[in-house]
């Protein structure tokens, strides 16, 4: 994939070399003309994070993954916990904490909610840039003194690029979660920023329908598909039941035995 690759680290050649190796392994090629840039941004003297920037729209700011601070820290401390819609849809109830495969992990937000209530979540992300952003966020979360231990236990990024590469006999989970990219109508600042950057990067998941069947083969209890309230069913397949929220719908499918 062609994208601008930038490092803002000026004092540690080992860190810039690490960034280059990560990009090469992900198949990223530097393109000076690309309006999108993956940036290794400095955080103090000895730390860094990866950011995705849309250079022709700098007011959008940078997109990055931060599980230990900001919005995600607030959500972990003051959010609904087990009462969050995604947790209910996955099947969190009482002492029941399903194991989960998040097959469209993205920036890992919903997976983090599930991990924060105690679910063990394995993540799959196929887009190389998004995967690097997620991997970087997990790296820093694993090192965090407050959440590091639970994050290492409950959130794991798998090496596969697609759930079809997983073996239902060995790699199954109680629940498989799907949240494919879909054109958004919402106008909130967060959605507007991230969707404008992300849709420029990956577009919509035009082959998202192909996720449903392998997900139903991997799931032992349910597949949960998050959809905007105005969207049709994934793969034009009616769910067995749905849970509705203000702006979204969780379509729930039973496994294929």
Curated annotation (Swiss-Prot):
Domain of life (superkingdom): Bacteria
Pfam families to which the protein is assigned, alphabetical: SAM_MT (PF04445)
GO cellular component: cytoplasm
Principal place of residence: cytoplasm
Gene Ontology terms, MF aspect: rRNA (guanine-N2-)-methyltransferase activity
InterPro entries, per database record: 16SrRNA_methylTrfase_J (IPR007536), SAM-dependent_MTases_sf (IPR029063)
Binding site for S-adenosyl-L-methionine: 109-110, 125-126, 179
Subcellular location: Cytoplasm
Keyword Cell membrane (UniProt): no
EC number(s) given by UniProt: 2.1.1.242
Keyword Chloroplast: no
Catalytic activity from the UniProt record: guanosine(1516) in 16S rRNA + S-adenosyl-L-methionine = N(2)-methylguanosine(1516) in 16S rRNA + S-adenosyl-L-homocysteine + H(+)
Keywords per UniProt: Cytoplasm, Methyltransferase, rRNA processing, S-adenosyl-L-methionine, Transferase
Family statement drawn from the similarity comment of this UniProt entry: Belongs to the methyltransferase superfamily. RsmJ family.
Function, as annotated: Specifically methylates the guanosine in position 1516 of 16S rRNA.
Protein name: Ribosomal RNA small subunit methyltransferase J
Organism whose genome encodes this protein: Actinobacillus succinogenes (strain ATCC 55618 / DSM 22257 / CCUG 43843 / 130Z)
Protein's gene: rsmJ
């Amino acid at each position: 994939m062609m994208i601008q690759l930038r490092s803002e680290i000026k004092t540690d050649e080992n860190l810039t070399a690490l960034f280059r190796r990560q990009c090469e392994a992900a198949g990223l090629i530097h393109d000076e003309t690309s309006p999108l840039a993956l940036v290794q941004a400095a955080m103090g003297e000895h730390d860094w994070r990866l950011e995705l920037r849309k250079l022709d729209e700098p007011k959008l700011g940078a997109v990055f993954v931060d599980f230990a601070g900001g919005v995600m820290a607030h959500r972990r401390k003051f959010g609904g916990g087990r009462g969050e819609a995604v947790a209910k849809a996955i099947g969190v109830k009482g002492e029941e904490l399903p194991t989960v495969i998040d097959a469209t992990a993205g920036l890992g937000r919903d997976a983090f909610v599930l991990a924060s209530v105690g679910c063990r979540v394995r993540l799959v992300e196929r887009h190389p840039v998004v995967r690097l952003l997620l991997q970087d966020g997990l790296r820093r979360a694993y090192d965090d003194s407050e959440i590091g231990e639970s994050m290492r236990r409950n959130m794991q990024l798998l090496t596969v690029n697609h759930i079809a590469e997983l073996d239902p006999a060995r790699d199954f989970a109680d629940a498989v979660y799907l949240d494919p990219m879909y054109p958004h109508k919402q106008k909130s600042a967060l959605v507007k920023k991230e969707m404008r950057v992300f849709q420029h990067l990956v577009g919509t998941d035009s082959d998202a329908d192909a996720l449903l069947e392998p997900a139903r083969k991997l799931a032992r209890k349910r597949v949960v598909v998050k959809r905007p309230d105005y969207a049709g069913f994934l793969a034009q397949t009616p769910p067995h039941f749905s849970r509705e929220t203000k702006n979204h719908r969780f379509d729930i499918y039973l496994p294929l035995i």
